[in-house]
Regions:
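N-terminal Rossmann NAD(P)H-binding glycine-rich loop of SDR-like oxidoreductase domains
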Residues: 2-24
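Catalytic Tyr-X3-Lys loop
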Residues: 81-96, 100, 133
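Conserved cofactor-binding/catalytic machinery of classical short-chain dehydrogenase/reductase
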Residues: 67, 93-94, 109, 137-138
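Conserved Rossmann-fold NAD(P)-dependent oxidoreductase catalytic core, especially the SDR/UDP-sugar
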Residues: 70, 96-131
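NAD(P)H-binding glycine-rich loop region in Rossmannoid oxidoreductase-like domains
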Residues: 50-90, 118-122
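Active-site Tyr-X1-5-Lys
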Residues: 128-145
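Conserved glycine-rich Rossmann-like NAD(P)H-binding loop of the short-chain dehydrogenase/reductase
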Residues: 25-34
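Rossmann-fold NAD(P)-dependent oxidoreductase module
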Residues: 16-20, 101, 141
Length: 145
């Protein structure tokens, strides 16, 4: 069985991927503790608990993952001042922590979900909101790695 990490597995896309893949693969997932009740209780599911990025780094390095599917995000259509840190932490910082680890771990497949709002009205580099701008920025980090 392949070992797959799915981030954002309690969201709409991530939960559907988890449901579709869980019977055929070993699935690792990172979950905020307040979302644990939403998770499928399959024998193939491994939940990665962590309190900070250093702890996550140590745990990821012990895994031999084949694929990472990155669905985790913090979505806010019309952000407020207090949303900025949450958007940056979830949509840019967390993804970069993953990418840095995966680069060292030599994981071959990284699938990232983004948004069509990166190119609002069909115009390239015309983000609809801060959320879509953060997703676009993360795409640049993916290109770096």
């Amino acid at each position: 069985m392949k070992k797959i990490l799915i981030t954002g597995s309690t969201g709409f896309i991530g939960s559907n991927l988890l449901e579709n893949l869980i019977d055929r693969h070993i699935i690792y997932t990172t979950v905020r503790s307040n979302n644990l009740k939403k998770i499928n209780k399959s024998k193939n599911l491994r939940i990665i608990h962590f309190k900070n990025h250093n702890e996550l780094n140590k745990k990821l390095k012990k895994l031999q993952l084949n694929t990472v599917i990155h669905c985790a995000t913090h979505y806010v259509k019309n952000h407020k001042f207090e949303d900025i840190k949450k958007i940056i932490k979830a949509n840019i910082e967390f993804g970069n922590i993953l990418l840095e680890n995966l680069n060292v771990m030599n994981v071959k497949k990284f699938i990232n979900f983004t948004t069509v709002w990166e190119n609002y009205d069909g115009t390239k580099n015309n983000s609809f909101n801060l959320y879509s701008a953060s997703k676009k920025a993360f795409g640049n980090f993916i290109n770096f790695y």
